[in-house]
């Protein structure tokens, strides 16, 4: 329902916007063109920008200014939220973004209303499709930057605006579940809640997120965070609910979101061609709680690659910076490579590469073979 199908360069925002989700099989979409900190700050419904006045056409550029819109770099006095790094171009709703935009004023979203807008659309979709099979991809903006929760959530977390945005996200998820319950659909509806990466606190705005953590450690016992090849960047929350099929419980099975394709193909009796989803494995028994094991191995990526096999993890040698200074995140780069046993050392603090030279060599060989083949599924 709210995804990010286009990146800088984009289409003509004043005409039919194609290709998009409909061209790859969706019947309907209500989406954000990019992340909330990028222009254009509008919604797209199917092929058109919502609420666009044709007399006020949209222009977008990520290379140079367009129109006469003020920027955060030149007019910081107009900002209600200042950037900490980047995010200093066109100002929309008192917040400077990545990229330049002009026009489309009637179509621009209101940041504090985004959760309500997207969730209302998702609830309507469920109501309209209650009597037939459906697939809903519901991607919230929260807790991505800029963090501007609705006033009814402000101050509710005790951990500043980032915590409040997470409370708002929790409300969004709750509305979806409550709707399924109200429509008497939960027993035959598989719901997955997950994230695209690990946490980040300062991701481009001086919003007080760092100062208001109040002892909370978003990454928990893990090392790194968003942008990192350490587990704090690549290991993400994953909750599956299917009351009619899956019993409540916990699992340590190794699975990846890419595995959804092969797993749900198996669930629905479909066959994947060899060239389709070349890195997707069928881990349906693990997802359904019928097996405690998932895939045998996993390639992780964040600039450099890592190889997970059971609890053991090889991070290949990397020449990049060890710290992303803008976000204060350990990246995982090390010129000699790293090897960890995650059962004994979940925080990846004890590099065992020197003591496991043969295993490191074997894992690196397998990683290189997959890189050269361009696929990991046989």
Regions found by a protein language model. Give the residues of each.
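Catalytic-site neighborhoods of secreted/periplasmic enzymes
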Residues: 1-104
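C-terminal cap/loop subdomain of S1 sulfatases and analogous C-terminal strand-loop tails that border
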Residues: 7-37, 51-52, 199-231, 245-338, ...
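Loop/turn elements at helix/coil->beta-strand transitions in domains of secreted/extracellular proteins
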Residues: 24-27, 129-136, 185-191, 235-236, ...
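Active-site His/acidic residue clusters
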Residues: 39, 45-48, 122-164, 200-202, ...
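Long, internal low-complexity/basic segments
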Residues: 75-90, 94-99, 111, 122, ...
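Anion-binding catalytic surfaces of enzymes that hydrolyze or transfer phosphate/sulfate esters
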Residues: 77-151
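Short glycine/proline-rich turn/loop motifs
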Residues: 95-107, 151-156, 241-245, 343-348
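Metal-dependent active-site segment of extracytoplasmic phospho-/sulfohydrolases and closely related
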Residues: 168-206
